[in-house]
């Protein structure tokens, strides 16, 4: 990745509120499925803004900090996604998005950020990001990048 795009907590909340406004009325949704780990914080923000209490996760591993690696489903939410919003922070090359679409064909799949290769795979997103740009999310940073304590 040649460029970095730094996301601050306040910008993330602004983007999540914008996305939530597009998902109104909230009564049309049974719940939210957050893609772990990138979709956990955006999922919590959407749940708050939409007043949704039913929140589940699908746990998919496809990144090892700066590098993409093989996709692995660790845990999935039940059902085909009907009436659910599936949220991730980013759609990049589309590997995770394809898996999400296969698992939850009836879900409404949204992200905060979208790169060109993955854009056609989501129903909605807020911010366009160039394909060669790495996104630094606020939960991954202190003043400088701070690796997770577990090393994973």
From Swiss-Prot:
CDD domains to which the protein is assigned, alphabetical: PRTases_typeI
EC number: 2.4.2.-, 2.4.2.22
Example of a GO MF term: hypoxanthine phosphoribosyltransferase activity
Domain of life: Bacteria
Enzyme's top EC category: transferase
Binding positions (5-phospho-alpha-D-ribose 1-diphosphate): 37-38, 69, 88-96
Pathway, per record: Purine metabolism; GMP biosynthesis via salvage pathway; GMP from guanine: step 1/1; Purine metabolism; XMP biosynthesis via salvage pathway; XMP from xanthine: step 1/1
Record-listed GMP binding positions: 69, 92-96, 134-135
Record-linked PROSITE patterns: PUR_PYR_PR_TRANSFER
Topology class, membrane: Peripheral membrane protein
Membrane-spanning ranges: none
Annotated GO biological process: GMP salvage; IMP salvage; purine ribonucleoside salvage; XMP salvage
Catalytic activity: GMP + diphosphate = guanine + 5-phospho-alpha-D-ribose 1-diphosphate; XMP + diphosphate = xanthine + 5-phospho-alpha-D-ribose 1-diphosphate; IMP + diphosphate = hypoxanthine + 5-phospho-alpha-D-ribose 1-diphosphate
Residues annotated as binding xanthine: 92, 135
Entry keyword set: Cell inner membrane, Cell membrane, Glycosyltransferase, Magnesium, Membrane, Metal-binding, Purine salvage, Transferase
Main location: membrane
GO cellular component assignments: cytosol; plasma membrane
Binding positions (Mg(2+)): 89
Cofactor needs: Mg(2+)
Annotated residues for binding of guanine: 92, 135
Location of this chain's protein in the cell: Cell inner membrane
Subunit note: Homotetramer.
Function (record text): Purine salvage pathway enzyme that catalyzes the transfer of the ribosyl-5-phosphate group from 5-phospho-alpha-D-ribose 1-diphosphate (PRPP) to the N9 position of the 6-oxopurines guanine and xanthine to form the corresponding ribonucleotides GMP (guanosine 5'-monophosphate) and XMP (xanthosine 5'-monophosphate), with the release of PPi. To a lesser extent, also acts on hypoxanthine.
Family annotation (NCBIfam families): PRK09177.1
Family per record: Belongs to the purine/pyrimidine phosphoribosyltransferase family. XGPT subfamily.
Name of the protein: Xanthine-guanine phosphoribosyltransferase
Gene: gpt
